[in-house]
Design a protein with these regions (language model features):
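Autoinhibitory propeptides
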Residues: 13-105, 356, 384, 391-393, ...
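Substrate-binding/access-modulating region of protease and related hydrolase catalytic domains
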Residues: 14, 232-391, 451-468, 556, ...
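Protease zymogen maturation seam
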Residues: 53-140, 151-157, 523-529, 536-537, ...
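Subtilisin-like serine protease catalytic core
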Residues: 95, 99-100, 113-245, 255-267, ...
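Active-site-adjacent substrate-recognition loops and nearby beta-strands
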Residues: 120, 132, 244, 352-394, ...
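Hydrolase catalytic cores
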Residues: 211-215, 223, 228-235, 407, ...
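C-terminal subdomain of the subtilisin-like protease fold in secreted/lumenal serine endopeptidases
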Residues: 229, 244-245, 255-282, 394-396, ...
């Protein structure tokens, strides 16, 4: 019986020859994507196994939904500086509309303002402060890839011009000529006007919250950035398999900005990831009899050959990280990873959440990368992370908790594939109308007295909340850059981030210790004003040093605006 398989090639240059060979061998196309290395074909399982042997082919996989993998929101529920001055909320049951999210003071503040071992759960719930943020994100395009974002939320209004910054871009009408073509079965990608929603019709909240942290005027970082949105999570979403095709076409074909003389940088946030959710079938968790075997670092463990701590859930959680209540597993999709790599190569900046499964994420070169569990739900790799967050080149963000010490959040994935940690617990941001929201959060939300009308806010947790902290900071770094790729973002973030201040291994240090490090970087997001408060600029270059007129031989670094060549 024929099924639909996604065939991913190693090289884009091989596509035309591959198309011709597949056609001559009688394979029908389900979906041809000329901008992508991925093509969807009808074939049998036996043909799929045989096709993998073609040296041009990287992967042949069933579509992710047919493997039990679905995209999930990852929430648990010219420098123009500005100041963030007021109360920063980090923990507690009380929050006000005038509170700022604590990511601002954590990321832009100094050691005193961060208040380690004093500010947060176990210490003071709020902190009054004043931090300077060095830029506002003007002339940068941020794209929020998430569930629906309300077009009319007041958080998207420019503080400088009082104009709405949300761009209702017509993705299908403008870009379908670059993205898709009619295939053997007549299938096409969506057409017509893009299905935007406003506060009165937005049944979701996650996209609003993420957007608020990236670019909100009160809760966010890039307060003057242009805001774009692609829905990847709702019933009317853009097909995930075409998401990065649209992002690449958008980036390549956007007009020249007449103010800067160049195309705006494209900085994208992905607070979602593929995974398998078994909580519906096992609402109270797994029983040890549900687990058949675990292959860990090449050794097979089971009831007859248990690990050091025994074949029971306390034991296998300590030894391998497989817990009775871990009913969600991250999943990788080779076709999505290939699209991500191509988008990064084109210059699209991709920042993504590490995911909320509390699993160790290994690098492909690590022995742990090939660990898998066989259970009642099938066989799953559990140390590879999620697509797109763990794909090569993506800036993968883990979540810091709101404890007064600076530990990772207990839900956050961790390990060497995480690039940087950022605040992701009790993050206050924009919200949707509680009377319209459906699902578990129906009726939940707080009216935003700053704006009145149909505007709301609420604090939630997740790596979904950590990733937009990094995305927002990246948008600030992007302003006035002649080129701005993922490698540039990574270098800039790493050059400023704080090393060694996070607390790991506060318990036993094994996988059952939810503060375990296991190869995680001790690196948390940080930015600082790149210029001293006095002195004159070197007029020879916008990327040059800062000079103090009283000390003409002394140059101050401008780390936030350093240009890194390819």
């Amino acid at each position: 019986m024929e099924k639909i398989y996604v065939v991913t090639l190693h090289r884009y240059e091989d596509l035309e020859g591959f198309y011709a060979d597949m056609e001559s061998n009688g394979f029908r196309i389900n979906l041809k994507r000329p901008i992508s290395r991925n093509t969807h074909y009808y074939m049998t399982d036996a043909q799929a196994v045989q096709l993998v042997e073609d040296s041009r082919v990287l992967a042949v996989e069933l579509r992710p939904e047919e493997r039990g993998l679905f995209p999930r929101p990852l929430a648990l529920i010219n420098n123009l500086p500005y100041n963030v001055n007021g109360t920063f909320m980090k923990s507690g049951s009380s929050v006000n509309a005038t509170d700022f999210q604590w990511g601002h003071i954590q990321v832009a503040g100094d050691a005193t303002e961060r208040g380690k071992n004093a500010f947060g759960s176990g210490g003071s719930n709020t902190k009054t402060g004043n931090v300077e943020v060095f830029n506002n994100g003007s002339d940068v395009d941020v794209v929020i890839c998430d569930d629906p974002v309300s077009t009319d939320c007041k958080e998207w209004v420019s503080p400088a011009t009082n104009q709405q910054r949300f761009q209702q871009y017509e993705w299908y009408n403008n870009l379908n000529s670059y993205v898709t073509s009619i295939d053997d079965d007549g299938t096409t990608l969506p057409t017509g006007s893009y299905p935007y929603v406003d506060q009165a019709t937005n049944t979701a909240f996650h996209g609003n919250h993420v957007t608020g942290t990236v670019a909100g005027r009160h809760y966010g970082w890039a307060r003057e950035a242009n805001i774009y949105h692609l829905d990847v999570l709702s019933a009317s979403a853009t097909p995930v398999m075409a998401l990065f095709d649209y992002l690449r076409a958008f980036h390549k074909h956007k007009p020249i900005n007449t103010t800067t003389g160049r195309r705006n940088p494209t900085v994208t946030n992905h607070s979602w990831g593929y995974g398998a959710d078994y909580s519906g079938d096992w609402p109270t968790g797994f029983d040890i009899s549900d687990i058949t075997s675990i292959v860990y670092n090449g050794v097979t463990y089971n009831s007859g050959n248990p690990g050091p701590n025994g074949w029971n859930f306390p034991g296998i959680e300590k030894d391998f990280g497989i817990g009775a209540n871990k009913t969600q597993y991250p999943g990788r999709v080779a076709a999505v990873d290939a699209d991500v790599e191509d988008a990064i190569r084109d210059g699209v900046v991709i920042i993504a959440a590490a995911s909320n499964d509390n699993f160790h994420i290994a690098l492909p070169t690590d022995t742990e990368y090939n660990n898998y569990v066989t259970a009642a739900f099938g066989t799953r790799y559990f140390n590879r992370g999620s697509s797109p967050g763990a794909a090569t080149g993506v800036i993968c963000v883990g979540a810091i908790s709101n404890n007064q010490d600076q530990r990772r959040a207990t839900f956050s994935n961790y390990g060497p594939r995480v690039d940087v940690w950022a605040p992701g617990y009790a993050i206050v941001s924009a919200w949707a109308d509680p009377s319209v929201i459906t699902g578990d959060y129906a009726g939940i939300g707080l009216a935003d007295s700053k704006y009145g009308g149909n505007n709301y806010y609420y604090p939630i947790n997740g790596t979904s909340m950590a990733s937009p902290q990094v995305c927002g900071v990246a948008a600030l770094l992007a302003t006035n850059k002649k080129r701005f790729h993922n490698t540039d973002v990574s270098k800039l973030i790493q050059s400023q981030s704080i090393s060694g201040e996070m607390d790991f291994d506060l318990g036993t240090g094994d996988f059952a210790d939810y503060t375990c490090k296991k190869g995680s970087p001790n690196v948390q997001l940080h930015i600082e004003n790149p210029r001293p408060t006095s002195g004159v600029c070197d007029t020879g270059s916008t990327d040059g040093p800062r000079l103090d007129s009283t000390k003409p031989s002394q140059c101050f670094p401008r780390r936030s605006t350093v240009f890194y060549a390819a």
